[in-house]
Amino acid sequence: LVQGMLKDGVSSWVPTLITEKYDVSASFSLLLSAIMPIINLSGAWIGTKLYEKVFRLNEAATSAFGFAMTLIPLTGIVFVGKYPIAICVILLALFTTIIAAMNHLLMTLIPVHFAKFGRASTVGGIFNCCTYIGSAISTYGFGAVSEKFGWTATVVFWIILGVIGVA
């Protein structure tokens, strides 16, 4: 759930965050946001290398490390609007790349372990279901939080979700 909330929820709200905090046009913020998926492709590669080489196929350690790493750019994003837009985009791209790595781990690498039991698809389906429940909650929820409390509170909420992901 947390991974889906962070992956899809943050990505969905990035253009609005940039538009509102930097007073740029929606089309410009969408253009900046369009760069991120290209950069995020490296997340799957990085996630696989961490999982196989650094954490030696330990899913829990890889996941905890990845979620801990999301806290670095998220902490910087708390101060969005107080530094140049380029830094914001770099921090957001770093965050979305890390969360893409976690998505690859949870959706692809972990379910493969269940193939020997004939359950890879079942596990993958359960993980996908949880991801999209999180996505649905965050798409509405992050907007509600930002409307009521502002973007700083929303990013602090993202940090709390990152901490939950570490646990």
Report each predicted region and the residues it spans:
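Extracytoplasmic gate region of multi-pass secondary transporters
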Residues: 1-48, 103, 107-108, 138-139
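Small/hydrophobic positions within alpha-helical transmembrane segments
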Residues: 2, 35, 39, 69, ...
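Helix-to-coil boundary motifs at intracellular loop junctions of multi-pass secondary transporters
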Residues: 17-22, 53-54, 109-117, 148
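Juxtamembrane helix-start elements in MFS-like secondary transporters
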Residues: 25-33, 88, 120, 124
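Helix-to-loop junctions at the C-terminal end of transmembrane segments
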Residues: 44-57, 146
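C-terminal transmembrane helical hairpin of 12-TM major facilitator-type secondary transporters
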Residues: 57-109
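A membrane-interface helix-boundary motif in multi-pass transporters
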Residues: 58, 141-162
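A late C-terminal transmembrane helix in Major Facilitator Superfamily
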Residues: 114-149
